[in-house]
Amino acid sequence: MTARKILLYPKDKEALRAKSESIHAFNKRTKQLIEDLKDTLIAHTDGIGLAAPQINVHARVVIVRLKAVSDGSREADPPIALINPEIVEAGDERRDFDGCLSFPGLYGETVRPHYLQVIGLDESGKPFDRTFEGFDAVVVHHEIDHLDGVLFIDRIEKFEDLYRVYVDDDGKPVRVPVSQIVGVGKEAIRISDVAE
């Protein structure tokens, strides 16, 4: 088991913003990368997706745990790998919960497709053409964004949509807008300033 260090924003901003290269040979190194990504995701039990750039490997590989729900009320399936994933169709855009292991404790509401058709290779190196719907589509879209250096904060439309989640005395999650935490109006601060 090799859990790798997850890059954090803004410290590792340059690496997280870099675009990833396609996998051209499905070999032992690719298999090891997939295992490292899975081990890293499993070690971070609150995560449902991880992209290779988040462990400082700029290859087009993502790991996702499907069948999760945005409120965390259902345990996700075991992680699967998508290699060289390419979105061929997207639709049904909606606002939904978004977060990222590279931004610990920071969450937001973003607009993402709730329908995706994706082609690529599975973890055996075999081609796939797969449809993802609902929150699964949100997760897959988020992870594919990482491969192009796009981060979830880039998709935040309003400062008020960015928040931290705390657990109250009853053990229930409470969303606190970042604007309340930093104590300044949205005119005085950009979303990227909060993340940095």
Model-derived regions: residue spans:
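Active-site rim/adjacent substrate-binding subdomains
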Residues: 1-141, 146-196
